[in-house]
Amino acid sequence: MKERFIKKTHYLDYQFDEHTDIKLGFTTRENGLSPYPNHSFNMARYISDSAHHITHHQDILANLIGYPRDEWVFPIQTHDNRIVEVTSEHKGTNIDKLTDDLHGIDGMYTFDSHILLTMCYADCVPVYFYSESHGYIGLAHAGWRGTYGQIVKEMLKKVDFDYEDLKIVIGPATSNSYEINDDIKNKFEELTIDSTLYIESRGKNKHGIDLKKANALLLEEAGVPSKNIYITEYSTSENLDLFFSYRVEKGQTGRMLAFIGRK
């Protein structure tokens, strides 16, 4: 399948098949101010970095994509599967500084326009949801815990229209070079999707897991047509020139920002 994320300055821009008022993308690590290691475009306030750097990067992205910072919403992610509906009242949450608002949220959706849903990533899977006909957009953060917790199915529980009208984009995340131990593998085998389709055993206590594929399988099992699910080829762990990777860089790294908004 043709790659739909097109590289632009500071971010990957998702190319839709049809004309749309939706903007969907994922930032890269290039050409910023942050020390990860140098001149990196870090988008997270919750790691060791200057607040000025983050605000400057936000301003740059805001100008590039046409969504001012006061229209952004950012939750405090905790690798859980809690979902919240956001409205215009949430605009600006956790953008200038982090607060207790939207704490413990790893999935958001809205039917309001002129809101940019944002979350940070550095190997975990960004899962974008949208329906042009229903004025709906959503964003989920699915690391191994969120995937095991079936956060994508929690997102679907909030969708009150036919899944034929729902499109899913699975964005840049770690490849199956990401390895889990026996205990985590056993957890995934509890799920009703076929673990052999996304887990590759490489020896005792070493198993490669394809989290992008796992989330796609969960969505399909829940009834989303496979034709409505797009999976990017971009891998955070295999493209360190473009992306931060928490696992490869042993936690000493920045974060990318996934975003989706509707005018």
From Swiss-Prot:
InterPro entries the UniProt entry points to: Cu_polyphenol_OxRdtase, Cu_polyphenol_OxRdtase_sf, Cytotoxic_necrot_fac-like_cat
UniProt entry tagged with the keyword Zinc-finger = no
- The reply on keyword Repressor is no
Q: Which Pfam families match?
A: Cu-oxidase_4 (PF02578)
Q: Which SUPFAM superfamilies match?
A: CNF1/YfiH-like putative cysteine hydrolases (SSF64438)
Q: Which reaction does it catalyse?
A: adenosine + phosphate = alpha-D-ribose 1-phosphate + adenine; S-methyl-5'-thioadenosine + phosphate = 5-(methylsulfanyl)-alpha-D-ribose 1-phosphate + adenine; inosine + phosphate = alpha-D-ribose 1-phosphate + hypoxanthine; adenosine + H2O + H(+) = inosine + NH4(+)
Tell me which EC number(s) this protein carries: 2.4.2.1, 3.5.4.4, 2.4.2.28
Q: What GO molecular function annotations does the UniProt record carry, in alphabetical order?
A: adenosine deaminase activity; copper ion binding; oxidoreductase activity; S-methyl-5-thioadenosine phosphorylase activity
Which residues of the sequence carry a binding annotation for Zn(2+)?
H79, C124, H141
> Which cofactors, if any, are listed as required?
Cu(2+); Zn(2+)
Source domain of life: Bacteria
Keyword annotations of the record: Copper, Hydrolase, Metal-binding, Oxidoreductase, Transferase, Zinc
Q: Which family does it belong to?
A: Belongs to the purine nucleoside phosphorylase YfiH/LACC1 family.
Function per UniProt: Purine nucleoside enzyme that catalyzes the phosphorolysis of adenosine and inosine nucleosides, yielding D-ribose 1-phosphate and the respective free bases, adenine and hypoxanthine. Also catalyzes the phosphorolysis of S-methyl-5'-thioadenosine into adenine and S-methyl-5-thio-alpha-D-ribose 1-phosphate. Also has adenosine deaminase activity.
* Quaternary organization: Homodimer.
| Record-given protein name | Purine nucleoside phosphorylase SERP0752
Q: Which organism is it from?
A: Staphylococcus epidermidis (strain ATCC 35984 / DSM 28319 / BCRC 17069 / CCUG 31568 / BM 3577 / RP62A)
